[in-house]
Structure formats: structure tokens, C-alpha cells
């Protein structure tokens, strides 16, 4: 299966664009696509038929032509063909309307919305805020610290799906901006194994292995995988105790799975998996290292999770499934004792999600109904030179959801979905001086409506509307004028209404064209604000909106050449508490990428891509002096595929661009820059 990436066309960037003009362009593309599809191909050199992309991240397996979400899919083959791709961040630069600034507190923005949530750093620690971007591995949603600082290895990965736009109605909490769904490979009933070694500049290394084998033929099988990646930061950081060498970056991932498919129980399958992940590295790779900045805080994360999945086809039309996950996690932030600001956290999570699928014999009705129970607790502590500040938090979520797709006619499908969710959030700072003891319960209904017109198997035109949300909370305001303050406050939940027009086109057997045009209307958007008295806190805004489009194409030009292109267009606007209109931070008007893969001789593969990010503001106040200029990054890889393996030579940031991607905390003294060029090689052997 090849990857789908919302296509980009080569278009000159404009500072602004009107939604009606954008829609006209998209409609024009759609019309031309339909006309093309109705024309018989006359090119005798066309390659084999393009495979159809299948997505699984919305709890239902469906083709891309039946999927309304703006999604990009990377399967194992596509990951292998992406230059230097060994962890999830290597793929995110190929997502339109997504900006990943590099290692630091900030998660990627999605369509201009900060995936980290309304705040980062100490303000977020006290408030216990929730991310807006959900990242899950085998059904377990990662915590903020694991996403921002932790390991997200791509080794032995079956598929990665990146969804742009609210996924709350299907994913639940922490998905109002989007979702990244990662599915690892299951055990196989035949023997297979692989080892991989990689080396590169800045002491980069990767050591990975995998083995899968049957225990009882065609019934019981196991799979084990391991991946370790190391490198040195490109920033010249100091060593100090207790952190050690702040330049050292390391991630480890270990997984084990058992698959049981008893022959005596037809249609029944269960998988039990255990996963350990840990990482360490500087909290940020911003380049200011003068004075004490060289003693960069070091963040360590670790987690251990157990997942139990059941799938049982009860009869021809009904299938029961259940996902149960239990996790324990811990995070540690080490700092220079002369400027001590250590942070530690320990917590645990449990969730269970049963669901029932129905597919009518004629295929006219496709439905699912399910429920989810989630419970988490966390104890954390902030320790400075003079005091320790213990904190605690817990979340309990109960939800029920359903989705029904009904074929009104042979060419019109209607989908209705809804999720009712009740969430109780507690947050307490134990120090009586701060008087923070928050306990709030929220109930919310999240509907979705989708109508799709399919004139033939290779064409889809659709419109959908869906609601998303992010839960509220409480925290301690910081006042830099007073050098502290720490007054308690509360903020409300935020809501988003998402409207999208989408098209899917298969042009002959060699070209795909995908478009999603969106408008997002936010109610009570959460954002860090500075009040007139100097308090810095999370506040709810009256008005915010984003609109734009993702356009993607994939072309099998010949048997040996595959090309792709992606374009993201975006406009954002919000009003501060004082009524001033601003753009959202890290929200460029244009993003784009293009690339391809060429096979030649016998087993050689050349792949390359280039990604463009337009200019954007680094801070919420739209300060011109910390505005980020547009930048490019290019990557290339030459691989040789042989019977029992693959050898590759790769270069990331091929032209060694060193543009600034973010000014941390809006300060010119802390620029975060593109990682320098890395040249490396890898060898994988399959047995």
C-alpha cells in the first residue's frame, strides 16, 4: 500500500486568500478530475494499477474513497521509502497544514491550532492542561510529555495515519485539533525476523530487531521487537549533575505480543501486548547557550503499558470488539542546581472500550455502537531552590458513541454519528498558600453528519459537519511583574464546529486527487493571555476561526516512478480579551511538499522529498520581530533492496538549511532552528 498525502500543487504563496476563491479552485480541480476519469487512458506505458489506500484509525476499516476526514496514511513500505524516517517527527514534515518546530515544549500545530493545548511549560504543569492533538499507539493515547519529549519509534510499524481536524466524536478526549494513529505489526503464523543497524553524523545510531513465529500452528503466535536510537544534540550543551550530558538524546522501545486464534472458535481473535518506552534528552534544542542556558534542563520519560484486544465475529452481520489498556508512566525534569526547577511526575491510566459492529448482508447499512471508560491519576511535584510544591490530578471519563452509515441510493451515502461524554477533572496543589483545589464535571454531546455522493467507484463528493471539544480546568497565574503571584483561576472548556467539503478522485489507474476544504468556528477557545495587571494565565476567548484546504495527489507515472505532491492553505483569526484581532501562532498561510520514488536497474530505489513552510508568527501577540521567515527542507535516500534485506544511504536536510523555526517564549535569545544536515546509512537483514 502506498501513502496518501493530500496533494499540493505548485502555487505562488499569497498573504491572504478568500474562502470563496479557494472553493472555486477546489471545485475546478474536482470537475476536471471527474472529466479525466471518464476518459479512457491511452498511455500504453502505464504501470500496474494503483493500490487503494485503506484507513483504520476511525474505528472502522474503510477505503480512502469512503473516508471524509483529511488524512494521510503511511504504511511500512512508504515509511521505508521516506528518507531517514525512523520516528514519527520524520513524517510530520510531509503533512500539509501541520507545523512541527523541532524538539521542545511545543507539539505540532494542526491547521493553526497548537496541539500542545492552551499552554506549555510551568503554566501548563500547574493547570494540568490537556493536549489537543491525540497520538495513540495500538489503542493507547500517549500523554503530553510522551508526545513532546518521548519515543515514537517507527520500527515494526504496520501503519501511521495522521488526521487533520477535530476527531473528538470518534477518539474522545484530547483530539480537538486532530489525531495521529499508530498501529504496530501483529504476530504472524509464519516465521519472520529482521535486524537493523543505522549510523549517522552527530553520533546517530539505531539498533533494532524483530522476531515473529508460531507457537501452535495457525492458532498461537508471538512477536517481539526492540528499537534503540541515539544521537547528540546539535546544540553545544553542558554536562552537569544530576542530569549528566545534556547533549545525549536516546529513545528505547520494546514490544511483545501474543496472538491467539483458536480453531475451535471460528471468528475469534485476541491479542495481548506489552510495551515499554523510555527516552531522555534536552527539554529544548533552542540554540542560545550563553551562561546558564548551556545547562539545559534534561527530560526523561518512561512508560509501561499492557493492551488486550478481542475481536469476535458473532455471525454474518455482527462483530464484537474490545480494547483494554492499563499503563504506568513517569517523567523527570533535571535542572542545574544553581537554578533549580526540577519536576517529577508518576501516574497510571486504565481504559476499556467495547464496541459492536453491524454490516448488513447487502452492505446497505454499516453501523457501530460502543462505550468507553477511562480513568487516570497523576502525582507530580515541582521543586525549586527553596521549596517543594506537590500537586495531584485525576480524570474520569465515561462515554457512549455510535455511527450509522446508510446507502440512500447506489450513489448517495448518509452517515450520522454521535458521542456523549461525561468527564470529571480534579486538580490540586497541596501547598495551602496557593489555594488550588479544582473539581469539575462536564457533560458534552458531540454530533457528526456526513453526506457523500459517489457517481462511480472512483469519485466521491461530500460534505460533513462535526463538533469537537477540549476540557477546561484550573491553574495558578504567574505574574512576572511581581516575580510570582501564583493566584488561582479557572478556565472553561472550548468547543469547535468543523465544516468540510471533500472530494476523492481516481483518474484512470495511475492518479489520485484528494481535497478537503474546511471552516472551523471556535467557541471559548483556550489560550494563554496576559491581563492588564500582569497576570499570565489561560483564558477563554470569545471568537476564533480558521479556514483553508488540503489538496493532495499521487501519480504512478510509470512502472518505476511514483510522484506525490501536497498543498495546505490556511487563514486564522482570533480576538484577544481586549478585542484586538490577531493570527494564531505557528499558522502559515501556505505549506507544501513534493517528492517521489524512482526504481532503476535491479533493486535500486532513489527517493526524495522537499517541504515548504510559509512565514508565521512565533507568538500569540503577532510581534513582527519574532516572526518566522518561510523555509524549505529537502531529504534524499538511495537504497538497494536485495532478497534478504535493504541497504540505504540517506541525507536529511540535504542542503543544510539553518532557518529559525520558533522563538521560544517569543524571545530573540532562544531561537529554535532546523536540525543541520545529517548523512547516514542503514542496513536491514530479513530472515
From Swiss-Prot:
Subcellular location: Cell outer membrane
Domain of life: Bacteria
GO biological process terms held by the UniProt record: siderophore-dependent iron import into cell
Upregulating conditions: Expression is up-regulated by low iron concentration condition. Iron-regulated expression is repressed by Fur.
Gene3D superfamilies noted in UniProt: TonB-dependent receptor, beta-barrel domain (2.40.170.20), TonB-dependent receptor, plug domain (2.170.130.10)
Phenotype seen when the gene is deleted: Unable to use transferrin or ferric vulnibactin as iron source, but able to use heme, hemoglobin and FeSO4 as iron source. Reduced virulence (increased LD(50)) in infant mouse model.
Membrane topology label: Multi-pass membrane protein
Secretion signal span: 1-37
Domain TBDR plug: 63-185
Molecular functions (GO terms): high-affinity ferric iron transmembrane transporter activity; siderophore uptake transmembrane transporter activity; siderophore-iron transmembrane transporter activity; signaling receptor activity
A GO CC term assigned to this protein in UniProt: cell outer membrane
Record key words, sorted: Cell outer membrane, Ion transport, Iron, Iron transport, Membrane, Receptor, Signal, TonB box, Transmembrane, Transmembrane beta strand, Transport, Virulence
Motif (TonB C-terminal box): 670-687
Stretches assigned to the TBDR beta-barrel domain: 190-687
A Pfam family per the record: Plug
Listed InterPro entries: Plug_dom, Plug_dom_sf, TonB-dep_rcpt-like, TonB_rcpt_b-brl_sf, TonB_rcpt_CS, TonB_sidphr_rcpt
UniProt record similarity statement: Belongs to the TonB-dependent receptor family.
Function: Involved in the uptake of iron in complex with vulnibactin, a catecholate siderophore synthesized by V.vulnificus. Binds and transports ferric vulnibactin across the outer membrane. The energy source is provided by the inner membrane TonB system.
Protein name: Ferric vulnibactin receptor VuuA
Taxonomic source organism: Vibrio vulnificus
Upper taxonomic lineage: Bacteria, Pseudomonadati, Pseudomonadota, Gammaproteobacteria, Vibrionales
Amino acid at each position: 500500500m502506498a501513502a496518501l498525502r493530500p496533494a499540493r500543487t505548485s502555487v505562488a504563496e499569497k498573504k491572504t486568500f478568500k474562502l470563496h476563491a479557494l472553493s472555486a479552485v477546489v471545485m475546478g480541480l474536482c470537475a476536471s478530475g471527474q472529466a479525466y476519469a471518464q476518459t479512457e487512458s491511452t498511455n500504453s506505458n502505464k504501470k500496474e494499477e494503483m493500490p487503494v489506500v485503506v484507513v483504520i484509525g476511525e474505528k472502522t476499516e474503510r477505503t480512502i474513497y469512503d473516508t471524509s476526514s483529511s488524512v494521510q496514511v503511511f504504511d511500512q513500505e512508504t515509511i521505508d521509502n521516506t528518507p531517514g524516517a525512523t520516528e514519527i517527527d520524520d513524517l510530520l514534515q510531509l503533512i500539509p497544514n501541520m507545523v512541527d518546530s523541532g524538539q521542545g515544549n511545543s507539539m505540532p500545530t494542526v491547521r493553526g491550532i497548537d496541539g500542545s493545548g492552551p499552554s506549555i511549560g510551568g503554566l501548563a504543569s500547574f493547570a494540568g492542561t490537556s493536549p489537543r492533538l491525540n497520538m495513540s499507539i495500538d489503542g493507547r493515547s500517549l500523554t503530553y510529555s510522551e508526545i513532546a519529549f518521548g519515543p515514537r519509534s517507527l520500527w515494526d510499524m504496520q501503519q501511521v495515519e495522521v488526521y487533520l481536524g477535530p476527531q473528538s466524536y470518534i477518539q474522545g478526549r484530547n483530539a480537538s485539533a486532530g489525531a495521529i494513529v499508530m498501529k504496530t505489526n501483529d504476530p504472524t503464523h509464519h516465521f519472520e525476523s529482521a535486524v537493523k543497524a543505522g549510523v549517522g553524523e552527530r553520533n546517530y545510531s539505531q539498533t533494532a530487531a524483530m522476531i515473529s513465529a508460531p507457537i501452535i500452528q495457525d492458532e498461537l503466535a508471538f512477536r517481539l521487537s526492540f528499537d534503540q536510537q541515539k544521537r547528540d544534540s546539535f546544540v553545544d550543551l553542558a554536562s552537569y549533575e544530576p542530569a549528566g550530558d545534556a547533549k545525549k538524546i536516546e529513545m528505547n522501545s520494546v514490544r511483545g505480543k501474543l496472538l491467539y486464534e483458536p480453531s475451535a472458535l471460528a471468528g475469534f481473535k485476541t491479542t495481548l501486548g506489552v510495551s515499554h518506552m523510555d527516552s531522555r534528552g534536552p527539554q529544548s534544542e533552542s540554540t542560545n547557550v550563553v551562561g546558564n542556558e548551556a545547562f539545559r534542563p534534561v527530560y526523561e520519560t518512561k512508560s509501561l503499558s499492557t493492551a488486550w484486544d478481542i475481536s469476535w465475529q458473532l455471525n454474518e452481520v455482527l462483530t464484537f470488539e474490545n480494547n483494554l489498556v492499563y499503563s504506568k508512566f513517569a517523567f523527570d525534569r533535571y535542572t542545574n542546581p544553581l537554578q533549580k526547577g526540577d519536576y517529577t511526575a508518576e501516574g497510571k491510566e486504565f481504559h476499556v472500550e467495547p464496541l459492536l459492529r453491524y454490516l448488513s448482508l447487502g452492505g446497505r447499512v454499516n453501523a457501530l455502537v460502543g462505550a468507553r471508560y477511562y480513568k487516570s491519576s497523576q502525582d507530580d511535584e515541582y521543586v525549586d531552590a527553596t521549596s517543594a510544591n506537590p500537586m495531584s490530578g485525576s480524570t474520569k471519563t465515561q462515554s457512549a458513541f455510535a455511527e450509522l452509515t446508510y446507502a440512500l441510493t447506489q450513489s448517495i451515502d448518509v452517515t450520522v454519528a454521535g458521542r456523549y461524554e461525561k468527564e470529571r477533572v480534579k486538580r490540586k496543589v497541596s501547598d495551602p498558600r496557593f489555594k488550588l483545589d479544582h473539581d469539575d464535571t462536564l457533560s458534552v454531546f458531540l454530533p457528526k453528519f456526513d453526506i457523500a455522493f459517489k457517481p462511480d467507484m472512483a469519485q466521491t463528493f461530500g460534505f460533513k459537519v462535526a463538533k469537537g471539544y477540549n476540557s477546561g480546568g484550573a491553574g495558578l497565574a504567574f505574574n512576572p511583574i511581581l516575580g510570582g503571584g501564583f493566584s488561582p483561576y479557572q478556565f472553561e472548556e472550548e468547543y469547535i464546529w468543523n465544516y468540510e467539503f471533500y472530494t476523492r478522485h481516481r483518474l484512470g489507474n495511475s492518479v489520485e486527487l484528494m481535497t478537503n476544504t474546511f471552516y472551523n468556528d471556535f467557541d471559548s477557545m483556550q489560550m494563554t493571555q496576559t491581563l492588564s495587571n500582569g497576570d499570565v494565565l489561560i483564558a477563554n476567548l470569545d471568537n476564533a476561526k480558521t479556514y483553508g484546504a488540503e489538496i493532495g495527489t499521487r501519480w504512478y507515472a510509470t512502472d518505476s516512478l511514483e510522484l506525490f505532491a501536497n498543498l495546505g492553505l490556511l487563514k486564522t483569526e482570533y480576538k484577544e480579551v481586549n478585542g484586538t484581532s490577531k493570527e494564531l501562532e505557528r499558522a502559515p498561510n501556505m505549506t507544501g511538499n513534493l517528492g517521489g520514488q524512482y526504481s532503476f536497474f535491479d533493486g535500486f530505489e532513489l527517493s526524495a522529498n522537499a517541504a515548504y513552510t510559509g512565514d508565521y508568527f512565533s507568538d500569540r501577540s503577532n510581534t513582527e520581530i519574532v516572526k518566522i521567515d518561510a523555509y524549505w527542507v529537502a531529504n534524499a535516500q538511495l537504497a538497494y533492496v536485495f532478497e534478504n534485506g535493504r541497504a540505504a544511504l540517506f541525507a536529511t536536510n540535504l542542503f543544510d538549511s539553518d532557518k529559525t523555526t520558533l522563538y521560544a517564549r517569543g524571545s530573540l535569545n532562544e531561537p529554535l532552528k532546523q536540525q543541520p544536515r545529517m548523512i547516514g546509512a542503514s542496513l536491514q537483514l530479513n530472515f
